[in-house]
């Protein structure tokens, strides 16, 4: 019976594990920051049915770029598989190769470079943070008409603090470029649990690129800057 199990005998269902493999021979420099190609994987028991012997094993796998200045991860849609279910190591190998082959690093680096070409003033920055805080309180029907924003209130507060104090990306008292803004978002995401880290990494990329486009007149993320 479970009541007679020692602590060392008990299975901990909320255990999470992650790995990160850098490929330093594939790199790019953006705004003075070196980015290495990186492969990241997550395994979370709390998202699996541990009682079933025949159910596929669940993994999350991503390939993207890691900012070597701060270890922030840049994840893109074509480089992320959030629900990779396999029944063998061969299946995992094939799924990983398929993900890697579909990833377009040149396109993603071009998008990251473009962030450095756009700046916003302090008022615009505060407006965006205010909208991000407001997003959390919106009714579900309203949120459905706005692009997703997955950062928590605590993480948004971290973005505000880093804007003032971060040694690499602070811009207090001056205009902030979108590359720095993006890294404030990805930096705040490092406080996420392992099993939500990659989802939020992708979301911060979409947010930064979407808000960048909105500053140039695009409508989709316009709500965050209005």
Feature-to-residue mapping (PLM):
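Intrinsically disordered, low-complexity regions enriched in serine/threonine
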Residues: 5-226
């Amino acid at each position: 019976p479970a009541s007679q199990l020692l602590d060392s005998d008990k299975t901990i269902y909320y255990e999470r594990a992650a790995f990160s493999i850098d490929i330093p021979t594939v790199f790019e420099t953006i705004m003075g920051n070196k980015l290495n190609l990186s492969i990241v994987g997550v395994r979370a028991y709390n998202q699996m049915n541990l009682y079933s012997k025949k159910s596929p094993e669940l993994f999350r796998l991503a390939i993207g770029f890691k900012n070597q200045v701060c270890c922030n991860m840049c994840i893109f849609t074509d480089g992320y598989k959030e629900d990779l279910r396999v029944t063998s190591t061969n299946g995992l190998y094939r799924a990983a190769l398929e993900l890697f082959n579909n990833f377009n690093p040149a396109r993603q680096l071009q998008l990251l470079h473009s962030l450095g070409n756009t700046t916003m003033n302090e008022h615009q920055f505060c407006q965006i943070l205010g909208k991000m805080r407001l997003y959390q309180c919106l009714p579900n029907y309203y949120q459905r008409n706005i692009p997703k924003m997955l950062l928590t209130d605590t993480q948004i507060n971290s973005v505000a603090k880093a804007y003032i104090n971060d040694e690499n990306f602070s811009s207090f008292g001056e205009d902030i470029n979108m590359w720095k803004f993006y890294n404030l978002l990805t930096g705040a995401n490092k406080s996420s649990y392992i099993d939500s880290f990659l989802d939020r990494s992708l979301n911060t990329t979409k947010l930064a690129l979407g808000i960048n486009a909105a500053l140039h007149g695009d409508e989709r993320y316009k709500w965050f800057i209005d």
